[in-house]
Amino acid sequence: MYQLSLNERCEEIEDIMKKTVLIVGVAGRFGRQCASAMRDAGWHVRGFARTTEKANCIDGVEPYVGDIMDPTALGNAADGADVIVQAANPPYQLWKTLLLEMNQAVIDVAINVGATVVVPQNVYIFGKKGGVWKEDAPHVGSNALARIRMTMEAAYKKAAINHGLPILAFRMGDFIDGPDHRPSGNWFENHITKAVATGDFTYPGPMDRDHAWAYLPDVARAIVDILNTPNAVVGHLDLNFPGWVLTGASMKTAIEHAVGKPMKRKKMPWVPMNVIALWSAPLRNVVSLRYLWNVPHRLGTDRFDRLLPHFEATDPTEAFTNRWET
């Protein structure tokens, strides 16, 4: 009878001890970066997406195909998972009809399998008054998107209180993808740096206002560090990510250093955008967030700093250089 060698036994024990994470929406920016970072940190990573191609988008990730609204498909993918990363996010125009249901589906499955949930949060809920937005800052529903997010966040807090579900609510500024970036519809790629190749830098607001940014490779690295910290996530843990605080001018300078040439500053065409927004729901939602470019803001990160006191963010110029070299 064949007996396992010592090395094979060690590998078998190692596989058993590996923690399992399910990334829901693995093909998106946030999902891809989390999947790669957790795989590299030794986690057993499962990727859940609507198509086989998307579920297989990251090497070394076990693919699961299905719809987030299908409890059987999502439940099968989550079975035995220690952590679920909720990285699925519909377009703005579908938030009203889909966002709450999608996140409730994740909550229900997480309660059933006993998994910790990591859910990314944004800054929309802080309203139009700038400054330092701390974790305990009041939530203000100043627009429709903010009110939907507030309802969604309340559902996670309710699950933590009523069911003891561990939640890592990770709040960040606007996303900036890593060197392996793929086409997406965010501010940085679709507007600000869309024409970098031709020397244009299109900024949505005044060039002297602080703006919160989240470099996703750093975000994923921080999430791994938190999840690998014993007893870090108990109940509902609301954390603000430090990220980068950049003005338009400092971002432009960093990009100029990265690409090795001066950039011509252009302004966003807000006037025609406002007109088109009268009958375009997607653009109407974009226009409703214009204030974030006029109001200087940053995230207060006291809780994060206590939890990960030695965390160091990637330098923006280094990140931009890596991005445009690839």
Predicted regions and their residues:
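N-terminal Rossmann NAD(P)H-binding glycine-rich loop of SDR-like oxidoreductase domains
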Residues: V21-A41
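NAD(P)H-binding glycine-rich loop region in Rossmannoid oxidoreductase-like domains
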Residues: E53-V113
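Conserved Rossmann-fold NAD(P)-dependent oxidoreductase catalytic core, especially the SDR/UDP-sugar
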Residues: Q104-T151, L168
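Conserved beta-loop-beta element that borders a ligand/cofactor-binding pocket
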Residues: N122, A154-D180
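Short-chain dehydrogenase/reductase
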Residues: K96-L100, G131, S142-A154, H181-E189, ...
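Conserved beta-strand positions in the Rossmann-like core of class I SAM-dependent methyltransferases
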Residues: R46
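Mid/C-terminal beta-alpha module of Rossmann-like enzyme folds, strongest
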Residues: L6-T20, A222-V286, T301, R306, ...
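NAD(P)-dependent short-chain dehydrogenase/reductase
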Residues: D174-D210
